[in-house]
């Protein structure tokens, strides 16, 4: 019998339905894989074996009774940003030590309602602030990929590094993730997995620990495009508890896979050809263009003139919202508390001890740009730039473009504790250069593996779609996936 952890969600669903395997067997296979690998990969920060087996048993009973849900018996990993009732939920921060919420996030509740099984909570950058999963209080995640003839540990990307690494290393069938400026798409590109950031409002943010509320959006990371479509169908919903969630029917995304893209117009934005971009990224982009052309799509050059302002504007808007959102962590009601001589001293000591360096940096930036003397010069101007970025996309789509193709990242995965990046945070921020525009405009974006670089590391392509048109992204990404093939790392752990 094949290793159960090698099954995609679609394959496992079929075998469970045909009663070739049981949910308990599948769950035990993943729990064994986690036990063997997690000490090395560090993808999970909390494993929930008892809960997983209990859920799997209930799934087997429902399958036996002919009442199987859409994800019945499928074992998933959950990013530590999602509130899971009575279970570890800390956003991988010291300040939330011991926090176990009394509520379940809407997205995870949707998954459990469809019969999914929870394996545990996944590592991530602290409060989702980072591009390499090195800011976690629980230590860095190791990318399951290594360069050819190298034993150097690489980052899996961030902030959803645990989600991407767990999917790539087959430590879960699929994972939840969140994306504020690229935190689903960049890790997916670094690990040879598929990640989709849906349109802002497609998935409820209720019960998800907030970073930047106008940018955050939940989505799945999966092994292939079909699995991502299956997961998003279950995750997405309107939610009266989240006023930013949109009351639109959730389509059957899986049905879009395999549909023809003949006659579709794919935009290629000239502004994404950034200075110093490696030749391999340009070659991958051209290869993506060729694949879509071969499938009958029409390629059109487009301009998104305000792209160059997206990164600086993002790094004003996101920290500003974060400084406000993170003001609630003060040691009074939950999490870490460091005693002080009075309440203000307690606040200061708790926050000094509880937040990591990158989180402190972003709170400081955010507080600065919101301060009386600088609000107009920074925050207000960044919001105006955001409107212009959104308008660029609207004009492109209005002119008849169906989707936009770009690289997902400016490079393949880099080393853990890279000295060059550690000494210059702005260099780390540049990892988001191709992804932040999508969040600023509230659009859907998907990262799909396009090939390997000369070191044998995965590179991803990104497709950007019209609001709430994730179906077009799935069918187009599937064309790229069919042409490029699927990529799995050689096991070294």
Swiss-Prot record:
Keyword list, A-Z: ATP-binding, Ligase, Nucleotide-binding, Protein biosynthesis
Pfam families named in the record: Amidase
Reaction catalyzed: L-glutamyl-tRNA(Gln) + L-glutamine + ATP + H2O = L-glutaminyl-tRNA(Gln) + L-glutamate + ADP + phosphate + H(+)
Gene Ontology biological process terms from the UniProt entry: translation
Active site: 79, 159, 183
Protein name (database record): Glutamyl-tRNA(Gln) amidotransferase subunit A
GO MF, any single term: ATP binding
Organism superkingdom: Bacteria
Role played: Allows the formation of correctly charged Gln-tRNA(Gln) through the transamidation of misacylated Glu-tRNA(Gln) in organisms which lack glutaminyl-tRNA synthetase. The reaction takes place in the presence of glutamine and ATP through an activated gamma-phospho-Glu-tRNA(Gln).
InterPro entries: Amidase, Amidase_CS, Amidase_dom, AS_sf, GatA
EC number: 6.3.5.7
Subunit comment: Heterotrimer of A, B and C subunits.
PANTHER family for the chain: GLUTAMYL-TRNA(GLN) AMIDOTRANSFERASE SUBUNIT A (PTHR11895:SF151), TRANSAMIDASE (PTHR11895)
Family per similarity comment: Belongs to the amidase family. GatA subfamily.
């Amino acid at each position: 019998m094949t290793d159960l952890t090698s099954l995609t969600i679609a394959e496992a669903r079929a075998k469970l339905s045909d009663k070739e395997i049981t949910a308990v067997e599948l769950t035990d296979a993943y729990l064994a894989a986690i036990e063997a690998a997690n000490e090395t990969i560090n993808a999970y920060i909390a494993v929930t074996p008892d809960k997983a087996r209990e859920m799997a048993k209930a799934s087997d009973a429902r399958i036996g009774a002919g009442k199987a849900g859409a994800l019945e018996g499928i074992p998933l990993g959950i990013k530590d940003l999602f509130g899971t009732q009575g279970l570890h939920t800390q956003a991988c921060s010291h300040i939330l030590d011991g926090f176990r919420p009394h509520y379940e996030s809407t997205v995870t509740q949707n998954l459990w309602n469809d019969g999914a099984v929870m394996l545990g909570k996944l590592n991530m950058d602290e409060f989702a602030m980072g591009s390499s999963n090195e800011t976690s209080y629980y230590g860095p995640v190791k990318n399951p990929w290594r360069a050819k003839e190298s034993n150097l540990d690489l980052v899996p990307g961030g902030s959803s590094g645990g989600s991407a690494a767990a999917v790539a290393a087959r430590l879960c069938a699929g994972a939840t993730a969140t994306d504020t400026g690229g935190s689903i798409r960049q890790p997916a590109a670094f690990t040879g997995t598929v990640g989709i950031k849906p349109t802002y409002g497609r998935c409820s943010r209720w019960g998800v620990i907030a970073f930047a509320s106008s940018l955050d959006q939940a989505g799945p990371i999966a092994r292939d495009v079909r699995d991502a479509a299956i997961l998003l169908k279950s995750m997405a919903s309107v939610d009266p508890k989240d006023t930013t969630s949109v009351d639109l029917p959730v389509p059957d995304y899986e049905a879009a896979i395999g549909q023809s893209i003949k006659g579709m117009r794919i935009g290629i934005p000239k502004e994404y050809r950034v200075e110093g971009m490696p030749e391999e990224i340009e070659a991958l982009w051209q290869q993506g263009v060729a694949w879509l052309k071969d499938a009958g799509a029409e390629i059109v050059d487009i301009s998104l003139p305000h792209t160059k302002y997206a990164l600086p504007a993002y790094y004003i808007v996101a920290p500003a919202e974060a400084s406000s959102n993170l003001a609630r962590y003060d040691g009074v009601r939950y999490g870490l508390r460091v005693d002080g001589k009075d309440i203000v001293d307690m606040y200061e000591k708790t926050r000094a001890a509880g937040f990591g360096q990158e989180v402190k940096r972003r709170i400081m930036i955010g507080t600065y740009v919101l301060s009386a003397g600088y609000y107009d010069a920074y925050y207000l101007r960044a919001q105006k730039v955001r409107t212009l970025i959104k308008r660029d996309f609207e004009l492109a789509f209005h002119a008849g473009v169906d989707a936009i193709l770009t690289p997902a990242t400016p490079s393949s995965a880099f080393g853990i504790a890279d000295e060059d990046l550690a000494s210059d945070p702005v260099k780390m921020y540049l990892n988001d250069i191709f992804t932040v525009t999508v969040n600023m405009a509230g659009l859907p974006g998907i990262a799909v593996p396009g090939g390997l670089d000369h070191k044998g590391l995965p590179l991803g392509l990104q497709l950007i779609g019209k609001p709430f048109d994730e179906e077009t992204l799935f069918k187009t990404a599937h064309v790229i996936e069919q042409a490029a093939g699927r990529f799995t790392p050689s096991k070294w752990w």
